[in-house]
């Protein structure tokens, strides 16, 4: 009898513990980035450095790590290019359609990009704890053989230099969009791949959704002073930058001899970093529920300014709705940035096309804003579970 009682107590304790901590074996990696880059707005080329503190919270010893090099997809012969040429239903934004002898032909826009139009991201000087590591690039994936295996529950620091070129805007990221936005900087930096209970998710980039590692970002972007930026995170030097970010009553003047500004953003606990920029952006800011700053960055186009102005209080209403329907938005800013080729969610921001009617603007903003909960808080693997 005592044995039976003892077993029941153990079993009950196990059930109680499971209720308190329903997934006691759960772990996730952490990637904390520090990046500095300079953008040449004439050539659309950029150079930068990255310091990544990577924490291995798994029970596995890692001998290799993998990074995404997303811009490499925008090159003739890339996996994304070949896919566009071989599937039956390619994205219409990514192809050209014409007729040859009365037969419709679909051609990948990537296949005709010239060297100064392609995207690329080149990595050099990759080090682990100050020692050069062996690297190999295959398409959009960088494979790194570690100098020293990364043990479970330990961390290490990786440093690298990167040299990139922004591709012609074909899908999501790119330069000179169809609406004239200069820079849609999404999936632009060397980004460590996710490692979870399934292993490495070093999926080649073919223009679809992404899966990322939680972490903190500290990013400094140096660019021509006439460009206004919207981005993931919080601008740290707003009274130095101006461009509509400065505190009320602060007047910001940049000396004539100043050619560039360095924008400093910090983003806590996100799994991506995106930004958009143009030298003809208007920037409006309103305060939403719980003091959340809502930023709106859009082209100074008289035909659409009224729609963008009228959309702003509607966005504040959307924030309140999602707060009540789902749960409080955990950050203190959200930016709606004109850019890209449709609409896509990123951490603390979205890039959307801006030449829309008011109902369309509100609709696409509602859709993308919802992703702030159902991707950028839950961090689901949309590469694997596309329905999510």
Segments from the language model and where they lie:
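Bacterial Sec-dependent N-terminal signal peptides
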Residues: 1-22
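N-terminal, polar/Ser/Thr-rich
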Residues: 18-47
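Short, hydrophobic/aromatic-enriched beta-strand segments in well-ordered soluble domains
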Residues: 50-52, 56, 69, 154-168, ...
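Surface-exposed beta-strand/loop patches in extracellular or lumenal glycoproteins
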Residues: 53-73, 81-89, 98-117, 204-209, ...
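Glycine/proline-rich low-complexity spacer/linker segments in large multi-domain proteins
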Residues: 77-92, 163-217
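Hydrophobic helix-coil surface modules that form long, contiguous segments used
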Residues: 191-199, 207-369
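Catalytic Zn2+-binding segment of zinc metalloproteases
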Residues: 372-385
């Amino acid at each position: 009898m005592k044995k039976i009682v003892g077993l029941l107590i153990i079993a009950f304790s196990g059930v109680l513990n499971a209720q308190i901590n329903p997934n006691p074996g759960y772990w996730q990696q952490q990637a904390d980035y520090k990046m500095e880059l300079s953008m040449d707005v004439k050539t659309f080329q950029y150079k930068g450095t990255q310091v990544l503190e990577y924490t291995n919270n798994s029970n596995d010893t890692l001998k290799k790590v993998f990074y995404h090099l997303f811009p490499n997809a925008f090159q003739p012969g890339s996996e994304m290019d070949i896919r566009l040429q071989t599937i039956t239903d390619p994205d219409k934004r990514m192809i050209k359609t014409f007729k040859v002898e009365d037969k419709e032909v679909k051609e990948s826009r990537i296949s005709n990009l010239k060297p100064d139009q392609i995207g690329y991201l080149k990595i050099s000087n990759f080090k682990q704890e100050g020692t050069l590591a062996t690297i190999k690039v295959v398409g959009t994936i960088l494979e790194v053989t570690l100098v020293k295996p990364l043990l479970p529950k330990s961390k290490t620091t990786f440093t690298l230099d990167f040299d990139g070129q922004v591709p012609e805007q074909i899908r999501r990221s790119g330069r000179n969009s169809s609406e004239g936005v200069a820079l849609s900087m999404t999936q632009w930096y060397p980004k460590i791949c996710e490692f979870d209970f399934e292993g490495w998710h070093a999926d080649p980039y073919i223009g679809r959704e992404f899966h990322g590692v939680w972490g903190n970002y500290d990013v400094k972007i140096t660019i021509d002073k006439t460009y206004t930026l919207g981005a993931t995170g919080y601008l740290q030097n707003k009274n130095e930058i101006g461009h509509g970010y400065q505190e009320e009553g602060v007047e910001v003047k940049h000396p004539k001899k100043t050619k560039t500004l360095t924008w400093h953003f910090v983003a806590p606990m996100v799994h991506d970093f995106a930004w958009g920029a143009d030298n003809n952006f208007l920037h409006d800011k309103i305060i939403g529920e719980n003091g959340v700053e809502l930023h709106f960055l859009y082209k100074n186009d008289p035909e659409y300014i009224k729609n963008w102005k009228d959309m702003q209080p509607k966005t504040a209403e959307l924030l309140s709705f999602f707060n009540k329907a789902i749960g409080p938005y955990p950050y203190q800013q959200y930016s709606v940035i004109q850019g890209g080729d449709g609409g896509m969610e990123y951490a603390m921001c979205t890039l959307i096309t801006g030449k829309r009617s008011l109902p369309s603007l509100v609709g696409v903003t509602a859709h993308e804003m919802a992703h702030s909960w159902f991707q950028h808080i839950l961090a689901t693997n949309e590469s694997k579970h596309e329905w999510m």
